[in-house]
Amino acid sequence: MNKLITLILVCCFAFNLYAEQLPAKQFSHPERIRYDQHCFTIEGRDIFILSAAFHYFRVPQELWRDRFRKIKEAGFNTVETYVPWNWHERTMPRNVKDYSQCDFDDLKAWLKMAHEEFGLYTIVRPGPFICAEWAGGGYPRWVAKFCPAKYDTSFWLRSNHPEHMKWTKHWYDAVCPVFAEEQLTRKKSGEKGIIMVQLENEYIYFGMESEKKEEVLRDMAAYCTNNGIEVPLFTCVTPEVRGSKDAVISQLFDMDNQYVWWNIQEAKSRIEDLKRQQPNAPAFVCELQGGWFSTVGGGLSEDSYLDGRHARGMALMAMAGGSTGLNYYMFFGGTNLAGWGARRMTTSYDYGAALKESGGVSEKFAAVKGVGDFVNRFGTQLARSEAIEFTTSDNIKDLTVGVRRTKEGTLFIFIFNKDKKKAFRDNVQFHIKGMPAFNVYCSVEPLDSKVLVLSQANGQCEWYPKEQTLPERPVNMPMPIRIAQAERCDETFQGNWRPLRKGVSLPEIGVNDCRYSMYRSVVQLSKKEVEEYGTLVCEMFTADPLYVQVNGKIAKRASTDELDNTFVIDGLLHEGSNEIVSIYENRGHAHGYRPMEELSGMKSAGLGKKQSAILPIEKWEVKKVENNVKDIKSLLSNNEGWETIMLDQSTIANLATLQIAGLEKPEWPAAWVLQGKEGTAIYRTSIDMTRQMLTEGQTMIEFACVDDAGTLFVNGKEVASHDAWDKPFVANMKDFLHEGENKVAIVVRNSSGAGGLLKGIRLFSELKILKPLKWEVALDLGGVTQGYCGGKTAGGDNWKVVTLKTDGTLHRKGNNIQPKGKQDALLTWYKVTFDLPKTEKECWIPWRAIINASGTGYMWLNGHNIGRYWEEGPQREFFLPECWLNMGGTNTLVLGLRQSETCGAVLEGIE
């Protein structure tokens, strides 16, 4: 025991010495706000910061007040938000000094409401990269226009490249002055304001050298201070900041993000690690993850099964480790209205949060409210408490225990029961230096946590958090409304058409969101040309699909890959005038890696030669091999250890979800061979080439995604290499093929994350544009232009009444449970109306729509875009914001559904 105490004293001495060697923290207004190794001190008072993440851009402004009220009721003293650049500057400015396209009215209103109406401090996180499962991670789509041709980092955005930093400065110069006036330092004493501003976001996950990251952080800090930001600046999960001796970076402090799931005890150890690495700043959790996001084709937030025990336990274990600042991410998640979520994100951003998407509360809300009550009672004491060493009886193997003591001697004993099934009910004996041994009877449910407050002053002890009560539910709920019929109309393409200049993207002409747009070309063809051309070849700015009709007939895609924008139009063309119309579906702006820096829309398109066939190559064998492949022939001739994989369309769709959501292993384990690992795998297949295929040049092979890099071999000879994981790998094998069976192999090298062949492979004749076409573009669908979204049914005879199912259950969630129909148009509009009862003002009841339909598109409630409906699911239930409903009156719900090639667009039922 004496050796242990000596070791502790030595460690504490080394810890303090290390802290003293770091540059002293400087504060613009230390009398208003400052911090030390323990906590924040605001206007002379030590504060335990309990913060709720609440994104103002994910809920209608009319509902902010309700969400703030519930945040306040739960005991929070602070609220946190990201500030998305692309939300506030939606149109490309004329130049880097032009700020005329920025609109910050909602940000200013939100800050004012938080500070003045609800007395909450705020934390602002302006990026420019925010992640947040938000379109582009916050970057405007138009920024990609300025992407340099060459750069030496993993990708351009987030890097130290001068062009990126120039536009980052543009953003900071625009946004910082807006919220500078809302800083605590600009307010009167006693008023609330912004207490912290974040630079960048989770920089640890961006692949760039530390020196370059430090350069970025120094510049960002200067952009802030030059624009009047006086409150402390921070980062999250950015190791370069922790313990830095750099003159600028040492004035920042880093926070932890905790994704501990049910390993709740890690919340304590992570905070202890943070305090060791950063001994001169408070230990703050920027994202205390109490839930998770939903993904298209994956699972919903509710499927993560993180309940009130989890929300309570994370907070208490972080406090046990010494945290004096916690930000629940998300406390309120909200909705990705109008498709503003990142690629493959559902409309719901409920996040499994304590405050539900609809504003409802649950047992998780009660659990967090209990934490809030505890912090409000003891936060000031906890802020400067110290961890103390102790020993216990040996019956606590299933418990994680932490003890902290205040200057006054009050003890906080934190306990977490790690056992998943068995409650802990027993006496635990504590031995603390300078105190007589004492027993504590602990009764803790499985995976639950508590804290015992033991007062030295009066010897009283009491368990926290206290159980909280939830509001009473209404006794008489309104009956569900099952819609019996709808009106249906196919898209007429009567948009506002304008000439499209060659090579111009949609962001350059004002489309920076994820709406549907249209392209049209009218071309005169001779009889000879009709016989010559048989494909429409489209080049895109990013991996989004087009849907095409030629002379009123739907053109089929050249392969099973939905992102293959080559169409077989042989038989659809005729001599004379031909009209080609296409709908562009923006699948969403990726929030990570190189797809972030891609423009959107169609780059060019024209007619190509006829294709005899485009063959998908779906059946492969794979095995993991040594990194340095020298003798490819020996490897291929050895038939041991190979596993068969089918790279068909369903496999590819499933893998796309797995890459984003990190879900369970798939049924096809071979595709998982390089998941999350550094390594090499070899894939092999056989292709039987006929003389006709060789004569017609059907020798091009395309791998839609080789992650991270690959080398192609044909019949044992090296053909080509490729190292751009986000670009297709296309090679011509004509010089290596012969009639009959050919052995094709690709060696794939992966450094991190998902690796291998992640998309489809096809064999075809060379596809190129032989006859370029002139195009027009319409920025919106014809139905949007004609007012369908608001319920207008212009077009008269185009609208038909259809009957919906009114029996049976409509499932509120599920993947691939949509009704099956046949594609008979590119896009179809549906309109339903329903009457809602009046409700008493003191009675609040949220409404939702359960929809079962095939097709993918957007939904409008009384003219407001409430988000995106994805055919594949899993989301089938959608929040209807009460501020957009006509209570006691008639409401209109409109769906614009792009028909799927396999199921059409069938609206089966709405409730």
Positions of the model-derived regions?
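Carbohydrate-binding surfaces of carbohydrate-active enzymes
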Residues: 165-179, 183, 190-199, 205, ...
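Aromatic-lined ligand-binding clefts that engage carbohydrates, nucleic acids, or primary amines
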Residues: 523-525, 529-552, 580, 642, ...
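An active-site-proximal structural segment forming one wall of the substrate-binding cleft
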Residues: 103-124, 149-194
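Aromatic- and glycine-enriched glycan-recognition loops and surfaces
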Residues: 55-73, 94-115, 215-216, 530-534, ...
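Glycoside hydrolase catalytic-domain groove-lining segments
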Residues: 243-297, 314-315, 355
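Aromatic- and acidic-residue-enriched segments that line the glycan-binding/catalytic groove
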Residues: 93-102, 127-157, 209-213, 217, ...
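N-terminal carbohydrate-binding accessory modules
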Residues: 19-78
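Aromatic-lined substrate-binding rim segments of carbohydrate-active enzymes
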Residues: 64-135, 221, 225
